[in-house]
């Protein structure tokens, strides 16, 4: 098997396992330099090491074979929600996860036509090729709402809406370490991808704002390396996209009223914290009032009217595009988890994790 060994697959598997070259070397009984040479293609691992590599990294031995479609990503091609607090190893793991999502999407698109990419300014978009949005975040948000025919009111089913416009949205399973260690991120490679993470899934309003934030990165920042300025711009985009100034302003209290903001939270689908900030941003309250409001919110946390709501109660805010594409391919193209696992050289469990589908096994019922 070493004759068809793909060095980039070793790098991908190692990053997915969040292991260093030294870790892999120790498990194999070789030097870190040897692992480095395997990954650069200077040398190849002995055939007898391949099964051990597969065991250590948790992939089938066929995972390392060359010839499968791939899309290599690096950190310059993605925007991380918490860039400064995301260690390099975790960013690399998240990017390797995104690479796998691309491979899965590619495999499904060979069989099923996904929604066309309707994202102005996105280089790969079929609907608005070459079109650009304004560079000002708020103006860009208003223009995208107009192009998507969203009107002036609250945004319902945000994640489903993004998927309907050709954006692949995924949320790693809670069992995936990256779900807890890496905040949301987005990338424009091939087809726009937004990765939402389980660490915000207990609060649907934070989850929706994060999705809108990543949408802002996709339309505003291209492949530019993220920084604090771009994070603020993505926040400004999300605020205007979810709560357009002209629409929300007449409903905001002129004096701080958390009970009223709790009502507006239900209508507009954004957190009370976001609404407090919006009041300050629009000049309705002072910095001092804003600080007192945040202190009061901390005291009210968990009380009736101020309890976070889980994403699990809102189907329109849960990714479903890839799962639905798989289900359609099963029906129309005789696809199965086993077929995808063989084609991608993944374990069946990994395929199910990324598709968010349960293992289907017959239930044995004993007759008494």
Please annotate each region the language model reported.
Residues 1-368:
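Short juxta-domain linker segments that transition from a proline/glycine-rich
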């Amino acid at each position: 098997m070493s004759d068809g060994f793909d060095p980039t697959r070793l790098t991908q598997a190692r990053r997915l396992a969040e292991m260093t070259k030294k870790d892999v070397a120790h498990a194999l009984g070789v030097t870190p330099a040897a692992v480095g040479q395997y990954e650069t293609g200077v040398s190849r691992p002995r055939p007898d090491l391949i099964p051990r590599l597969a065991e250590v990294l948790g992939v089938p031995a066929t995972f390392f074979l060359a010839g499968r479609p791939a899309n290599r990503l690096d950190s310059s091609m993605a925007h991380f929600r918490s860039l400064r607090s995301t260690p390099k190893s975790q960013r690399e793991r998240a990017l390797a996860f995104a690479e796998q999502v691309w491979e899965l999407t590619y495999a499904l698109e060979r069989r099923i036509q996904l929604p066309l990419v309707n994202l102005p300014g996105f280089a790969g978009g079929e609907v608005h090729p070459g079109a650009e949005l304004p560079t000002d975040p708020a103006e860009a948000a208003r223009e995208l709402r107009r192009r998507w025919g969203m009107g002036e009111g609250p945004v319902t089913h945000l994640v489903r809406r993004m998927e309907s416009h050709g954006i692949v949205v995924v949320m790693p399973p809670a069992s995936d370490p990256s779900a807890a260690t890496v905040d949301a991120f987005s990338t424009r490679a091939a087809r726009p991808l937004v990765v939402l993470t389980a660490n915000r899934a207990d609060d649907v309003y934070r989850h929706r704002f994060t999705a809108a934030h990543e949408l802002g990165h996709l339309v505003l920042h291209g492949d530019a390396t993220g920084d604090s300025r771009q994070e603020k711009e993505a926040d400004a985009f999300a605020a205007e996209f979810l709560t357009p100034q002209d629409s929300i302003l007449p409903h905001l209290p002129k004096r701080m009223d958390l009970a009223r903001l709790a009502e507006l939270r239900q209508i507009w689908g954004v957190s009370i914290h976001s609404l407090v900030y919006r009041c300050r941003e629009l000049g309705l309250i002072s910095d001092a009032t804003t600080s007192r409001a945040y202190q009061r919110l901390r005291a009210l946390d968990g009380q009736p009217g101020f309890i976070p709501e889980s994403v699990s109660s809102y189907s329109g805010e849960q990714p479903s595009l890839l799962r639905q594409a798989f289900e359609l391919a099963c029906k129309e193209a005789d696809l199965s988890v086993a077929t995808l696992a063989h084609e991608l050289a993944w374990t069946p469990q990994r395929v199910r994790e990324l598709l968010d589908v349960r293992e289907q096994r017959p239930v044995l019922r004993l007759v008494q």
